[in-house]
Swiss-Prot record:
This protein's record includes keyword Cell cycle: no
Description of the deletion phenotype: Inositol auxotrophy.
Lineage of the organism: Eukaryota, Fungi, Dikarya, Ascomycota, Saccharomycotina
Organism expressing this protein natively: Saccharomyces cerevisiae (strain ATCC 204508 / S288c)
The protein, known as: Inositol-3-phosphate synthase
Record-listed NAD(+) binding positions: 74-77, 148, 184-185, 195-196, 198, 244-247, 295-296, 320-321, 323, 354-356, 369, 409-410, 438-439
Induction conditions: Induced by valproate. Repressed by inositol.
Length: 533
């Protein structure tokens, strides 16, 4: 930090000449080091280190309030999110069988985790809260609205979800009753038929009150107006839209339908049968310049929609929240492979009794979830051609089962077995039984996705020209926000790039991203203070 500039009041101050604070902006010089690798015919790796200098710019002025619009506002996740914000904002304590509880955001990485800053004078690690390094919006400042195909207010939705303690529900009743979802879009072919009984709050009704899939462009325009009205009525500068509604079936990606931006928009106008409700919401958000996050496993981001985001410069992220079984899998599978142990089969079984499980009991919707859950180990397998190759086999037998069991409600039961090959024909079996309250794991992830998406909207960068230091203009990130992969089962990537699923790699990327912005080097564990004389 230069002496003639004063840093904003934060918990962390870095003494460095890499950072300059000016007019509510933080400018940081950063040298990105990597290595380009080629493999010769003889099997030798030729490695060439590379360096590219950048200047990053962060707008230090976070919004006083952030608009959040959820598709599926009246579902388990939506009602739990609103309840958590209200409970924390108003400090609503409540009784449980274990005594009085204070509200918190446990399970949220941005609110309740720490990261290593460095060491103290004795060589001990020093940690700071994740959200203390740079200004981040607080979930207490969320202004939440959204859409749902069911018209229940959020107190009714909270009761129906059976997620929160009874006393907390009663203490939040007055405030939750005031929140009512906007009418949503319901195309019956895309979700399970058993959801039809809930669909009493839809914009796509004909003159006789029957659901119609005609007029999809009109539906898109309606969603755009909803976003505009929400911003205006609440005096919001920023809004983020997130899908936490039912899992849809996969859509067919077809030339002339959804393969390009132009074809996609025309297909919406033509009421094409492969235009799903999530496509309408995503396109409307992108056209409004509002970031859109897909929290479910369906393939909303067809090529035409990604092109639209590129054209409009609007952030998108997906797919599917990574909360329990899959998050553990992304850690355990990486551990086994990095240890030189070869997983040969992974069997994953779930049963749950909430509406998510009810919808997933239909084969087409289950297939969407199966695809997102199974892809989590792909890059981990590809990272080790000693264990996985043409001779030994390149695949892991990976089975996923999800069953609906109404009595267990939101307490999802997950059972996994990892069967691995050891040296000299030996085998290892790891069996895991995990019971988690699904929505209380998923809701903090939604909070993190929203906080970090807003943060990324305030970051820009430019490459440093070695000849003309002031050349170039600041650019935003590429529209697909892969920095958010930590919270997503099947991370959407830039076309031509492969997703990173390993949880530790994803967390490291986030930590180093924050560190570079405040002028700290990337994290390492060399610990020379101890290991060298």
């Amino acid at each position: 930090m230069t002496e003639d500039n004063i840093a904003p009041i934060t918990s962390v101050k870095v003494v460095t000449d890499k950072c300059t604070y000016k007019d509510n902006e933080l400018l940081t010089k950063y040298s990105y080091e990597n290595a380009v690798v080629t493999k010769t015919a003889s099997g030798r790796f030729d490695v060439t280190p590379t360096v590219q200098d950048y200047v990053f710019k962060l707008d230090l002025k976070k919004p006083e309030k952030l608009g959040i619009m959820l598709i599926g506002l009246g579902g388990n996740n939506g009602s739990t999110l609103v309840a958590s914000v209200l409970a924390n904002k108003h400090n609503v304590e409540f009784q449980t069988k274990e005594g009085v509880k204070q509200p918190n955001y446990f399970g949220s990485m941005t609110q309740c985790s720490t990261l290593k800053l460095g060491i103290d004078a004795e060589g001990n690690d020093v940690y700071a809260p994740f959200n203390s390094l740079l200004p981040m919006v607080s979930p207490n400042d969320f202004v939440v609205s959204g859409w749902d195909i069911n018209n229940a207010d959020l107190y009714e939705a909270m009761q129906r979800s059976q997620v929160l303690e009874y006393d907390l529900q009663q203490r939040l009743k007055a405030k939750m009753s005031l929140v009512k979802p906007l009418p949503s879009i319901y195309y019956p072919d895309f979700i399970a038929a058993n959801q039809d009984e809930r669909a009493n709050n839809c914009i796509n009704l004909d003159e006789k009150g029957n659901v119609t899939t005609r007029g999809k462009w009109t539906h898109l325009q309606r969603i755009r107006r909803d976003i505009q009205n929400f911003k205006e009525e609440n005096a919001l500068d920023k809004v983020i839209v997130l899908w936490t509604a039912n899992t849809e079936r996969y859509v067919e990606v077809s030339p002339g339908v959804n393969d390009t931006m132009e074809n996609l928009l025309q297909s919406i106008k033509n009421d094409h049968e492969e235009i799903a409700p999530s496509t309408i919401f995503a396109a409307a958000s992108i056209l409004e310049g509002v970031p859109y996050i897909n929290g479910s496993p369906q393939n909303t981001f067809v090529p035409g929609l990604v092109q639209l985001a590129e054209h409009e410069g609007t952030f998108i992220a997906g797919d599917d929240l990574k909360s329990g079984q899959t998050k553990l899998k992304s850690v355990l599978a990486q551990f086994l492979v990095d240890a030189g142990i070869k997983p040969v089969s992974i069997a994953s079984y779930n049963h749950l009794g909430n509406n998510d499980g009810y919808n997933l009991s239909a084969p087409k919707q289950f297939r969407s979830k199966e695809i997102s859950k199974s892809s989590v180990i792909d890059d981990i397998i590809a990272s080790n051609d000693i264990l996985y190759n043409d001779k030994l086999g390149k695949k892991v037998d990976h089975c996923i089962v999800i069953k609906y069991m109404k009595p267990v409600g939101d307490s999802k039961v997950a059972m996994d077995e990892y069967y691995s090959e050891l040296m000299l024909g030996g085998h290892n079996r790891i069996s895991i039984h995990n019971v988690c309250e699904d929505s209380l794991l998923a809701t903090p992830l939604i909070i993190d996705l929203l906080v970090m998406t807003e943060f990324c909207t305030r970051v820009s960068y430019k490459k440093v020209d070695p000849v003309k230091e002031d050349a170039g203009k600041f650019e935003n990130f590429y529209p697909v926000l892969t920095f958010l992969s930590y919270w997503l089962k099947a991370p959407l990537t830039r076309p031509g790039f492969h997703p990173v699923n390993g949880l530790n790699k994803q967390r490291t990327a986030l930590e180093n991203f924050l560190r570079l912005l405040i002028g700290l080097p990337s994290q390492n564990e060399l610990r020379f203070e101890e290991r060298l004389l």
